[in-house]
């Protein structure tokens, strides 16, 4: 963890992070994690900085050692209806609501907090400063990446397993050639253009 982060005075803290705001396809996935202070997990860092092998190993360790963890999501239709920011906030609310233990404080990666029934604080670069947020980042990323691999099996021509739905040159090329799948986000500009909605 880079800079020192001063934790709030609370006994049960959940960390929350999201994955999948930028892709053109699939859900935005969030996770909430409450770590067990008596069972520390070594090597937590922002999920994007870890190798896939290390991320998967930490994913299993978090599932085993965390006091509670849960996932939330907002589907492409919700993203299109609400916009990506509001859909992300909704997915975060769902992740916190699904925790088996109710936290008394929530730390959220980024600069905005969704409305929650308990105190919360946004932490910029929280995924590299707060262990609970790092753990949430790992849970969300592994979950979403697996969904993209499954989607790739259904639509093998788009390369979802490689680019995870992000607007790479390859993805944009296939989108233009093949059109949008039912899982593409119709409100995102490259998809809009292909559908003739832009």
Curated annotation (Swiss-Prot):
Enzyme Commission numbers on file: 3.1.26.4
A biological process term (GO) from this entry: DNA replication, removal of RNA primer
Annotated protein name in UniProt: Ribonuclease HII
Keywords for the protein's UniProt record, in alphabetical order: Cytoplasm, Endonuclease, Hydrolase, Manganese, Metal-binding, Nuclease
Subcellular localization: Cytoplasm
HAMAP family, alphabetized: RNase_HII_B
Bound cofactor: record note: Manganese or magnesium. Binds 1 divalent metal ion per monomer in the absence of substrate. May bind a second metal ion after substrate binding.
Function: Endonuclease that specifically degrades the RNA of RNA-DNA hybrids.
PANTHER family for the chain: RIBONUCLEASE H2 SUBUNIT A, RIBONUCLEASE HII
Cofactor(s) listed in the protein's UniProt record: Mn(2+); Mg(2+)
GO terms for cellular component: cytoplasm; ribonuclease H2 complex
Species of origin: Pectobacterium atrosepticum (strain SCRI 1043 / ATCC BAA-672)
Pfam assignment, any one: RNase_HII
Similarity field: Belongs to the RNase HII family.
NCBIfam families tied to this protein: PRK00015.1-1, PRK00015.1-3, PRK00015.1-4
GO molecular function: manganese ion binding; RNA binding; RNA-DNA hybrid ribonuclease activity
Catalytic activity: Endonucleolytic cleavage to 5'-phosphomonoester
Ligand binding (a divalent metal cation): 17-18, 109
Domain RNase H type-2: 11-198
């Amino acid at each position: 963890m880079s800079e020192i982060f001063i934790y709030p005075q609370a006994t049960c803290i959940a960390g929350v992070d999201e994955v999948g705001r930028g892709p053109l396809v699939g859900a935005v996935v969030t996770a909430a994690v409450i770590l067990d202070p008596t069972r520390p997990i070594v090597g937590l860092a922002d999920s994007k900085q870890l190798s896939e092998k290390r991320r998967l190993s930490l994913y299993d360790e978090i599932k085993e050692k965390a006091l509670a963890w849960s996932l939330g999501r907002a589907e492409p239709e919700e993203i299109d209806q609400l916009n990506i920011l509001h859909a992300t906030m909704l997915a975060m609310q769902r992740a916190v609501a699904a925790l088996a233990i109710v936290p008394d404080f929530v730390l959220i990666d980024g600069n905005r907090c969704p409305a929650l029934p308990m105190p919360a604080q946004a932490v910029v670069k929280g995924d590299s400063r707060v262990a609970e947020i790092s753990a949430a980042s790992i849970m969300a990323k592994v979950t979403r990446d697996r969904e993209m691999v499954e989607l790739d099996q259904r639509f093998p021509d788009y390369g979802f397993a490689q680019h995870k739905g992000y607007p790479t040159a390859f993805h944009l090329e296939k989108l233009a050639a093949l059109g949008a799948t039912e899982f593409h986000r119709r409100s995102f500009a490259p998809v809009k253009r292909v559908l003739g909605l832009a």
